[in-house]
Curated annotation (Swiss-Prot):
Gene that encodes the chain: wcaL
Superkingdom of origin: Bacteria
NCBIfam families: wcaL (TIGR04005)
Protein name per its UniProtKB record: Putative colanic acid biosynthesis glycosyltransferase WcaL
Entry keyword Kinase: no
Length: 406
């Protein structure tokens, strides 16, 4: 069986879940080809990029120059190159293909692809990729069934939904299978009009062979708190910093490390300075994986207080939480998006309402008083939950079976 992966941009260092799924299908013995519209950063990649020689398996459909005018010239040239083909003309149907017809993306691809890309099934990551894949199949550029994975921003951001809701409704008719990563997103797809029989929840997961549980340890003094996340609004790190201000006022001894980079870095650093928390809150920025692991080993609790962004952007189910639970680090998070599908409140971790710094500070203060006897059953249930419901190897085998039955 041949499996194609259809991506808007590849590779992206932030999308390790895509890379992991691609290599898993290769490891399972499937023939794998990758189609991407745009080329990502091929210099700063994960080891699997080289190990599996993924460049040789990838075809980029929009290898374009930079700059708006240069892009349009290039697309016009590619369109003219294939103007003798029927599908190139069809791709210019504005009523049927919308913005991707107007900006010549589809016609340029049709103009340069003489022989269709074939696979038994194409897995499209993120809703917009599924939309484009379905259009290209209709135009004869790709041949095969299409399964679209919906993650988070593609099904929650108001900007995305304002543009793509009509496109998604077309995808529900044109596509073969919708794969939301949570029950919450499955319900949302149904409300948008997707037939229930075209929906199957397929979670992201973690490779349990990479995570050995550490011994249960009581919280230290000072309490070691850690977050590993991209620095964006929906990660709720501004709420965490406000909670730290309250903890400090209450006299709770702690140290908080925020690992990661992102567009909210300056805002978070300003908040730390404003609250005079430089002595207890650190932002080391990007760290290589071995240093992150060492810091995680030192941590007493993993904190991810996710919130809904001002633009509606939401998490799916954060893999960072799964990894912490798999290795035996207690987690504190929020009642946000699909997180309660992973963390059972007060049983496999602790959840507080979104945007509630006071509740977060209270939870962390209470956590600092727990002993190993109280923590042991929570940590055990957390790993069992990930092992049972978020085990990457099991999930990928189940997905492969589902696709083979399409």
């Amino acid at each position: 069986m041949k499996v194609g992966f259809f991506l808007l941009k590849f590779p992206l260092s932030s999308e390790t879940f895509v890379l992991n799924q691609i290599t898993a299908f290769i490891d399972m013995g499937f023939e794998v080809e990758i189609l991407a519209l745009q080329k990502g950063d091929t210099q700063n990649t994960h080891a699997a990029w080289t190990k599996y020689n993924l460049a040789a398996r990838t075809r980029w459909l929009q290898d374009e120059p930079t700059g708006k005018v240069a892009k349009l010239r290039h697309r016009a040239s590619q369109t003219l190159r294939g103007i003798h083909r029927k599908n190139t003309w069809q791709a210019l149907n504005l009523k049927r293909y919308g913005a991707e017809s107007r900006n010549l993306i589809l016609s340029a691809i049709c103009g340069q692809v003489a022989t269709p890309f074939r696979a038994d099934v194409f897995i499209a990551h993120f809703g917009p990729a599924g939309v484009t894949a379905a259009k290209l199949r209709e135009l004869g550029v790709i041949r095969g069934k299409i399964a679209t994975i919906f993650h988070g921003i593609d099904i929650s951001s108001r900007e995305v939904l304002n543009h793509y809701t009509p496109e998604y409704q077309q995808l529900f008719r044109r596509g073969d299978l919708m794969l939301p990563i949570s029950d919450l997103w499955a319900g949302r797809l149904q409300k948008m009009g997707c037939p229930r029989e075209k929906i199957a929840v397929s979670r992201m997961g973690v490779d349990m062979t990479r995570f050995s549980p550490r011994p249960v340890k009581a919280p230290a003094t000072p309490l070691e708190i850690i977050s590993v996340a991209r620095l964006t609004e929906k990660k709720g790190l501004h709420v965490a910093i406000e909670a730290c201000r309250q903890l400090k006022e209450q006299g709770v001894a702690f140290r908080y490390r925020i690992l990661g980079i992102g567009p909210w870095e300056r805002r978070l650093r300003t908040l730390i300075e404003q609250y005079q928390l430089e002595d207890v809150v650190e932002m080391p920025g990007f760290k290589p994986s071995h240093e992150v692991k060492a810091m995680l080993d030192d941590a007493d609790v993993f904190l991810l207080p996710s919130v809904t962004g001002a633009d509606g952007d939401m998490e799916g189910i954060p893999v960072a939480l799964m990894e912490a639970m798999a290795v035996g680090i207690p987690v504190v998070s929020t009642l946000h998006s699909g997180i309660p599908e992973l963390v059972e409140a007060d049983k496999s971790g602790w959840l507080v309402p979104e945007n509630d710094a006071r509740a977060l500070a209270q939870r962390l203060a209470a956590f600092s008083q727990l002993d190993t006897d109280e923590l042991a059953p929570v940590v055990k249930r957390a790993r069992e939950k990930v092992e049972h419901d978020f085990n990457q190897q099991v999930i990928n085998r189940e997905l492969a079976s589902l696709l083979q039955a399409l």
